[in-house]
Structures are given as C-alpha cells and as structure tokens.
Amino acid sequence: MPQLNPSPWLLILLFSWLIFLTMLPSKTQLHTFPNMPSTQNMCKQEPEPWTWPWA
C-alpha cells in the first residue's frame, strides 16, 4: 500500500510548510488598509431623538 510509505508524503508536507512559512508572512505584513483608523472625537454628543414614521 503506497499510502503507508511516509517518504514522499513527509517531504511534500515539509516543503509545503516551508513555503507557507517563508512566503505568507511577508505577503501578510505588506498588506495595507485602505482607510487608516482615526482617533475618536472626545466630546460627548447628545443623541438626537428619532421620530417613528408610523407614530
């Protein structure tokens, strides 16, 4: 049964993890967000009352 022979599968597994661990961190660290987060306004705003259209 060739499935039980770990020789080719172990090498494939190791090479795939090697590729994932070398390429993916560099690609994810280069990701930029389209909108940079801004600081929240510190002054307290009063909520405006909302009128229900059916009332």
UniProtKB/Swiss-Prot annotation:
Location of this chain's protein in the cell: Mitochondrion membrane
Membrane-related topology note: Single-pass membrane protein
Name listed for the protein in its UniProt record: ATP synthase F(0) complex subunit 8
Gene Ontology MF terms in the entry: proton transmembrane transporter activity
Function, as annotated: Subunit 8, of the mitochondrial membrane ATP synthase complex (F(1)F(0) ATP synthase or Complex V) that produces ATP from ADP in the presence of a proton gradient across the membrane which is generated by electron transport complexes of the respiratory chain. ATP synthase complex consist of a soluble F(1) head domain - the catalytic core - and a membrane F(1) domain - the membrane proton channel. These two domains are linked by a central stalk rotating inside the F(1) region and a stationary peripheral stalk.
Swiss-Prot/TrEMBL GO biological process terms: proton motive force-driven ATP synthesis
Top-level taxon: Eukaryota
SUBUNIT field: Component of the ATP synthase complex composed at least of ATP5F1A/subunit alpha, ATP5F1B/subunit beta, ATP5MC1/subunit c (homooctomer), MT-ATP6/subunit a, MT-ATP8/subunit 8, ATP5ME/subunit e, ATP5MF/subunit f, ATP5MG/subunit g, ATP5MK/subunit k, ATP5MJ/subunit j, ATP5F1C/subunit gamma, ATP5F1D/subunit delta, ATP5F1E/subunit epsilon, ATP5PF/subunit F6, ATP5PB/subunit b, ATP5PD/subunit d, ATP5PO/subunit OSCP.
Region (Disordered) location: 36-55
Species lineage: Eukaryota, Metazoa, Chordata, Craniata, Vertebrata
Keywords associated with the record: ATP synthesis, CF(0), Hydrogen ion transport, Ion transport, Membrane, Mitochondrion, Transmembrane, Transmembrane helix, Transport
Main location: mitochondrion
Disulfide topology: none
GO CC entries: mitochondrial membrane; proton-transporting ATP synthase complex
Pfam families per record: ATP-synt_8 (PF00895)
Family of this protein: Belongs to the ATPase protein 8 family.
